Amino acid sequence: MLNRREAFAGFALTFGAVSFGLTTTAAAQSLTWAPTALTPAQARTVDAAAELVVPATDTPGARAVGVPQFIDRALGGWCDPAQAKLLREGLDGLDADAKAAHGAAFAEMTSAQQTALLTRYDDVRAPQRRFFALLKELTTIGYFTSKAGATVALRYDPVPGDYRGCVPLKEIGRGWATT
């Protein structure tokens, strides 16, 4: 015969298992696009890391302008095979390091934990430095070649005027972009 204590324990276990399944499903479905050159786990890692490299402020962040999709397309299209291999292995390594340090995939960690891990990767002596430099390079290229990156983050003028060489930045303000 089942007593009340055993019934409550069973309900708690069932509810815990269901809620765990829902949270892992929600994390797995967080992408709003279908990666073609990356695995879904790698795409989520790129999505989280790119947003840390170029976060949303008064200008759109990397995620909002489609940088993760840009990186996915770059890997599938014009990236050198050695670069693509370095990036894919680096993303897998980043996830493995995140799981070893915090018990969760990189995309599921807190922003502070993600920042701390990427700061370690940015160290000159870190073996992951080449991977992180490539990730930052692709992120900034993708960001500043997007419409929002070129027109909102930078000032856009199709014909910015006459050419004056070395001008103090105070005089002209932010950099200019042409697309």
Residue ranges and their predicted role:
Residues 1-15:
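N-terminal secretory signal peptides and thylakoid transit peptides that target proteins
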Residues 18-25:
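C-terminal segment of classical bacterial N-terminal signal peptides
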Residues 26-30:
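Boundary at the C-terminal end of the N-terminal hydrophobic targeting segment
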Residues 31, 41-48, 52, 66-179:
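Mature-region segments of soluble proteins
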Residues 56:
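Extracytoplasmic/periplasmic solute-binding protein
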Residues 60, 64-65:
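Zn2+-dependent metallopeptidase catalytic domains
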